[in-house]
């Protein structure tokens, strides 16, 4: 992965701007996690993902009240797919913190020493092992026999892939030797060698099937097959490097555990070594980096771990990662080639993603023919804040470019050689309509900068086929319409059959149509599996049994849909999947407006009263903000500060300097203020934007959504199909009513979202940070800084079991 430093935090960020950016970052991270862990088809590089994570952490550090309010704050991986049975990890599978240069590694070592209270001359051993680029897997052995195999999932709940794991040659069904504890959870990475990956892709190509992008995707897709015979046909490998639940300790050091694993027949990486000196650790990193091309499998860095397990226990965890471990990522690998075409892919959230079709070139031992171009600005050579990138050089068809494999996942075009640009080349014209549905594609105004967002998005929303499956999954989810049993498989079947294109279609489903679609999908998948694995057609008796099971499942599904014909208004608003309209904003809207017709009428009025672009731009000037903006509009921009205070807009030196820097000179500032004054928002707009629980960012997203006729029509059709009820009210008599509750650490009996929903239903406010005003902290395994804050402020701390007992009592 590219060695990428975090960008400096914009200290002029207001609380509202921070909340909006935090929400966008959280959504982007969760979507990236889903694509990487569930779909095995990432759309951004590791480096881009790390930048998102670091920006999120920067904002949390600057605005502590936001910490934990976004699901991405403490998320690990992604929710397990509904195609597999679920396994709750006895010990959560967390992720690692990252380092991108030597200084960050040195700071990690120093941080560990500070935490332990050790001086620099006290010996402290670290292991250093290659970071395998594959799929994390947890193997649970009971009395030495493989009992369960589960993927990481979201860190707390994974997918049961036991039958598939049994086909992996490196994974012993029975541990060798003796001395293993009764319960022994072994964790490691499933991967494919370069040679086996090439052979699999050759077979895919010969069969006319899509090729895998890289070994990691191929390994993940192979392990997560519904048919174990397909997994068995692919030569997956496994390295063990960690553990989960142990009924008894097996060693005193990380090194000792790995040695014990090896005696039990579990493969461990031979390039793992132990060091007591930071310089030696970094030298080992350089050796591994130099040797990576010849290893025969993909790695994307080196992982350092404190060797002493007693010290690991003392160091503990913070947020989503251990204090005692760090991943030191590799720099990117690059090559030069030619852009043969630029195409647009529409992402599942409506983003228009430009992709460069390249003349095939080998980068780091892998043939690359596609590379991400990120967004419209990146193609034009313009950054998110209008600054030039690549010195302003745009990217065109026919250009000779430098391609980088950042993190060995998604190749990226980094630079352009203008000396080789064809004389007849033309700038790329980015589409202003969605290639998938023809709806307008827009770049929303970023309230922090006053400039358009980097990503152009389709406004088709509910009717765009590229977004359809993901939108519908959100619609039926637990926090949306909560239609029991309606998993992603059913949604995919309905979309493929053309039975569902918008939410209202769910309430028009017919038994026979649904059954025909399910049978057709199963027969197609069965034929594909038989062709790949060489197995025979199932007997008719088995087919009849399956048909009977289908009938029962379909009846249950239709009954579940019917049971949701009455829905609270806040759930309906959240289920629509409108950007920036999360659960809290949906509740605020349902609280302010009596019913959907009233809300829709208010939206129409607000759309006619929106502020103009000059008003938005003035608000976005650093350090100006709403209060100063309004004084400028009322009193104008003074040439100096000699006028009486009541007659001038009181400006700080920094505000005055920023205004002049933004607009050019005093006359330009005054002209801009005059134009902004003529474009003030009307009262109908401010009803939404000035509401502290809604705000201007969510307001603009709401108006944009309903401005698209397709979306408005889809909502109208849905309202014709269901009865909308007032928002669910909290239980006033509950002992939790009006209390502030914070959850920290891993919850074992329910997910974080479920716990939050329970607390809110009982009238509590769930916060992401601890203060003296917090009433209760529920702490699970891995609780970190929030637990310390609770102890500092004298806040009551309870376990998850205690919390559930309190809930049962009301």
Curated annotation (Swiss-Prot):
GO molecular function: DNA ligase (NAD+) activity; metal ion binding
Catalytic residue list: 131
Reactions it catalyzes: NAD(+) + (deoxyribonucleotide)n-3'-hydroxyl + 5'-phospho-(deoxyribonucleotide)m = (deoxyribonucleotide)n+m + AMP + beta-nicotinamide D-nucleotide
Cofactor: Mg(2+); Mn(2+)
InterPro entries named in the record: BRCT_dom, BRCT_dom_sf, DisA/LigA_HHH, DNA_ligase, DNA_ligase_AS, DNA_ligase_CS, DNAligase_adenylation, DNAligase_N
TM helices/strands, residue ranges: none
BP-aspect Gene Ontology terms: DNA repair; DNA replication
Binding site for Zn(2+): 434, 437, 458, 464
EC number: 6.5.1.2
Annotated Gene Ontology cellular component terms: cytosol
Protein name, UniProt field: DNA ligase
């Amino acid at each position: 992965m590219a060695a990428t430093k975090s960008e400096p935090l914009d200290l002029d960020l207001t609380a509202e701007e921070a909340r909006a950016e935090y929400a966008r970052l959280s959504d982007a991270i969760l979507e990236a996690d889903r694509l990487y862990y569930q779909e095995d088809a990432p759309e951004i590089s590791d480096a881009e993902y790390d930048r998102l994570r670091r920006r999120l952490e920067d904002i949390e550090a600057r605005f502590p009240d936001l910490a934990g309010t976004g699901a991405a704050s403490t998320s690990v991986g992604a929710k397990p797919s509904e195609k597999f049975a679920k396994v709750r990890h006895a010990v959560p599978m967390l992720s690692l913190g990252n380092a991108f240069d030597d200084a960050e590694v040195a700071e990690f070592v120093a941080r560990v020493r500070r935490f332990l209270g050790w001086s620099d001359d006290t010996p402290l051993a670290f292991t250093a092992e290659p970071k395998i680029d594959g799929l994390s897997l947890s193997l649970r052995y009971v009395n030495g026999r493989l009992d369960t195999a589960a993927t990481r999932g979201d860190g707390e709940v994974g997918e049961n892939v036991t039958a598939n794991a049994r086909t992996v040659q490196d994974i012993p069904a029975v541990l060798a030797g003796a001395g293993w504890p009764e319960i022994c959870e072994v964790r490691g990475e499933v991967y494919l060698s370069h040679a086996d990956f090439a052979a699999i892709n050759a077979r895919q190509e010969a069969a006319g099937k899509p090729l895998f992008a890289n070994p990691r995707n191929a390994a993940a897709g192979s392990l997560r097959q519904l048919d174990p015979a397909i997994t068995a046909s692919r030569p997956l490998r496994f390295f063990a490097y960690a553990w989960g639940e142990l009924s008894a300790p097996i060693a005193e050091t990380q090194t000792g555990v790995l040695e014990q694993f090896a005696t039990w027949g579990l493969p461990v990486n031979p390039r793992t070594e132990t060091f007591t000196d930071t310089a030696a650790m970094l030298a080992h990193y350089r050796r591994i980096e130099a040797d990576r091309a010849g290893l025969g499998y993909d790695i994307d860095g080196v992982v350092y771990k404190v060797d002493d397990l007693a010290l690991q226990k003392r160091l503990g965890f913070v947020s989503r990662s251990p204090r005692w471990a760090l991943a030191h990522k590799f720099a990117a690998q690059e090559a030069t080639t030619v852009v043969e075409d630029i195409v647009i892919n529409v992402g599942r959230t409506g983003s228009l993603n430009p992709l460069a079709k390249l003349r095939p070139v080998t980068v780091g031992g892998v043939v690359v023919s596609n590379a991400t171009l990120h967004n419209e600005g990146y193609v034009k050579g313009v950054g998110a804040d209008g600054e030039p990138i690549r010195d302003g050089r745009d990217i065109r068809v026919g250009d000779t470019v430098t391609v980088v494999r950042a993190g060995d996942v998604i190749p990226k075009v980094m630079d352009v050689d203008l000396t080789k640009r064809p004389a007849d080349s033309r700038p790329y014209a980015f589409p202003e309509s969605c290639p998938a549905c023809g709806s307008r594609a827009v770049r929303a105004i970023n309230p922090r900068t006053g400039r358009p967002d980097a990503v152009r998005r389709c406004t088709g929303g509910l009717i765009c086929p590229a977004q359809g499956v993901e939108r519908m999954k959100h619609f039926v989810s637990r926090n949306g319409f909560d239609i029991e049993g309606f998993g992603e498989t059913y949604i995919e079947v309905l979309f493929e059959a053309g039975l569902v294109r918008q939410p209202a279609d769910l309430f028009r489903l017919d038994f026979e149509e649904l059954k025909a679609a399910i049978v057709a999908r199963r027969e197609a998948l069965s034929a594909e599996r038989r062709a790949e694995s060489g197995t025979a057609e199932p007997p008719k008796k088995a087919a009849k049994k399956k048909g009977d099971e289908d009938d029962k499942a379909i009846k249950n599904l239709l009954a579940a849909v019917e049971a949701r014909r009455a829905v609270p208004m806040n759930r309906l608003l959240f289920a629509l999947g409108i950007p920036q309209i999360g659960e809290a904003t949906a509740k605020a809207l349902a609280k302010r407006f009596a019913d959907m017709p009233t809300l829709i009428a208010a939206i129409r009025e607000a759309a006619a009263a929106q502020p103009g672009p000059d008003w938005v731009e003035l608000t976005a000037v650093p350090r100006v903000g709403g209060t100063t903006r309004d004084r400028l509009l009322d009193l104008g921009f003074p040439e100096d500060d000699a006028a009486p205070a009541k007659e001038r807009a009181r400006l700080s030196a920094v505000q005055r300097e920023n205004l002049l820097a933004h607009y050019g000179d005093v006359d330009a500032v005054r002209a801009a203020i005059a134009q902004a004054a003529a474009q003030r928002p009307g009262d109908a707009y401010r009803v939404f934007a000035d509401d502290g629980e809604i705000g201007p960012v969510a307001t603009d997203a709401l108006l944009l959504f309903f401005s698209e006729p397709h979306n408005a029509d889809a909502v109208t059709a849905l309202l014709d199909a269901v009865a909308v009820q007032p928002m669910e009210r909290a239980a006033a008599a509950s002992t939790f009513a009006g209390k502030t509750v914070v959850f920290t650490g891993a919850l074992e009996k329910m997910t974080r979202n479920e716990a939050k929903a329970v607390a809110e239903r009982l009238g509590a406010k769930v916060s992401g940070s601890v203060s003296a005003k917090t009433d209760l902290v529920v702490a699970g395994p891995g609780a970190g800084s929030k637990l310390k804050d609770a102890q500092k402020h004298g806040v009551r701390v309870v376990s998850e079991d205690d919390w559930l007992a309190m809930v049962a009592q009301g």
